[in-house]
UniProtKB/Swiss-Prot annotation:
This is 3-isopropylmalate dehydratase small subunit. The gene is leuD. One of its GO terms (molecular function) is 3-isopropylmalate dehydratase activity. CDD domains: IPMI_Swivel (cd01577). Belongs to the LeuD family. LeuD type 1 subfamily. It comes from Neisseria meningitidis serogroup A / serotype 4A (strain DSM 15465 / Z2491). Pathway: Amino-acid biosynthesis; L-leucine biosynthesis; L-leucine from 3-methyl-2-oxobutanoate: step 2/4. One of its GO terms (cellular component) is 3-isopropylmalate dehydratase complex. Keywords: Amino-acid biosynthesis, Branched-chain amino acid biosynthesis, Leucine biosynthesis, Lyase.
């Protein structure tokens, strides 16, 4: 998992509430369990004018010019700004995979669906909760200023605007530690590999019958 420390990046606005996981990555693209390759189909039904299916050459599909993420000013964005209850609907880890593969490192919203929120942390994507008033202000600034960038410092738990205004956000110490060090659940477990091996060897000596056969 990629570590997250700090970034300064273009912000892309998605001015919709209740964006569900099927909108983030439609169900027909869920056949793979690899974490990569989903970016070209993120927001597929809004992003393209035709219906997408696995195996299609996305470079030849007609883009929807009215979809915000298709606008030239938001190309290369690494921060997604959106509205409340982002990531609702069915549980699919493919949703944060798709956002990560698209290039996003963080998502800012007033609220997130619980399962999606937890899945973001497991996949190196930082979900930031701000108040609706703060999100409204950011939407106005993003839309009024082309090339608008925000700076996110995870260690300090701050988000800074181009004018120098700073917002703080909450995150548990455990989740912050994992993101700062690029540790998913497997990586976190492997940090304790020596202790695990020592425990298993001690148990092998004290309870050898468990290991016979």
């Amino acid at each position: 998992m990629k570590a997250f420390t700090k970034i300064t990046a273009i912000v892309a606005p998605l001015d919709r509430s209740n964006v569900d996981t099927d909108a983030i990555i439609p169900k027909q693209f869920l056949k793979s369990i690899k974490r990569s390759g989903f970016g070209p189909n993120a927001f597929d039904e809004w992003r393209y004018l035709d219906h997408g299916e696995p195996g299609m050459d996305n470079s030849k599909r007609p883009l929807n010019p009215d979809f915000s993420l298709n606008q030239p000013r938001y190309q290369g964005a690494q921060i997604l700004l959106t509205r409340k209850n982002f990531g609702c609907g069915s549980s699919r880890e493919h949703a944060p995979w798709a956002l990560d593969d698209y290039g996003f490192r963080a998502v800012i919203a007033p609220s997130f669906a619980d399962i999606f929120f937890n899945n973001c942390y497991k996949n190196g994507l930082l979900p930031i909760v701000l108040t609706e008033e703060q999100v409204d202000r950011l939407f106005k600034e993003v839309e009024a200023n082309e090339g608008y960038r925000l700076s996110i410092d995870l260690a300090e738990q701050t988000l800074t605007t181009p004018s120098g205004e700073t917002f703080t956000f909450d995150i548990t110490e455990h989740r912050k530690h994992c993101l700062l060090n690029g540790l998913d659940e497997i990586g976190l477990t492997l940090q304790h590999a020596d202790e695990i091996h020592a425990f298993e060897e001690k148990r092998r000596q004290s309870q050898p019958w468990l290991f016979n056969g």
